[in-house]
């Protein structure tokens, strides 16, 4: 199985929370990908952090070990889903989530996210949540 990691999963990994590192090892990092939108969100988070240098360095190290998927191949699907959801009167509020979701669909990847409700309205999406909160 191949996975697209949502930004929140990457943040949990970088912070050493919820044993995401163990799950990644179990699933195989070679089977995991991220969207370039996730890179954008991680960079914003690092820039907005208290220790920018440390945060950017952690992101740099993480990015060296994972394949980044561009959004270009998912733009048509993005437009289709955005129009479909708008016509249903249920617009996707977060454009970045929509782009990440359709990237998973178009690349036939399982989306790994803690925010399952943000994506479950997308046609054809497969979702897993690796986070167990106690």
Predicted regions and their residues:
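Active-site neighborhoods of divalent-metal-dependent phosphate/nucleic-acid chemistry enzymes
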Residues: 67-114
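Alpha-helix capping/helix-boundary segments
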Residues: 9-10, 38, 74, 117-118
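Generic structural signal for small/hydrophobic residues in well-ordered secondary structure
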Residues: 6-7, 42, 78, 104, ...
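A general structural signal for well-ordered alpha-helical segments in protein cores
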Residues: 39, 52, 56, 75-78, ...
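Acidic, PIN/NYN-like endoribonuclease modules and their adjacent C-terminal/linker elements
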Residues: 1, 101, 105-134
């Amino acid at each position: 199985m191949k996975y697209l990691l949502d930004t929140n999963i990457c943040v949990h990994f970088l912070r050493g929370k919820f044993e995401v590192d163990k799950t990644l090892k179990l699933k195989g990092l070679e089977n995991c990908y991220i969207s370039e939108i996730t890179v954008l969100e991680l960079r914003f988070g690092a820039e907005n952090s208290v220790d920018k240098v440390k945060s950017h360095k952690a992101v740099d190290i993480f990015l060296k070990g994972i394949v980044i998927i561009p959004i270009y191949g998912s733009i048509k699907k993005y437009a289709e889903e955005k129009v479909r959801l708008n016509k249903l009167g249920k617009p996707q509020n977060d454009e970045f989530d929509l782009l990440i979701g359709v990237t998973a669909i178009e690349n036939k990847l399982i989306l790994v996210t803690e925010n399952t409700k943000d994506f479950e309205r997308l046609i054809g999406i497969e979702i897993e949540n690796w986070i167990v909160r106690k």
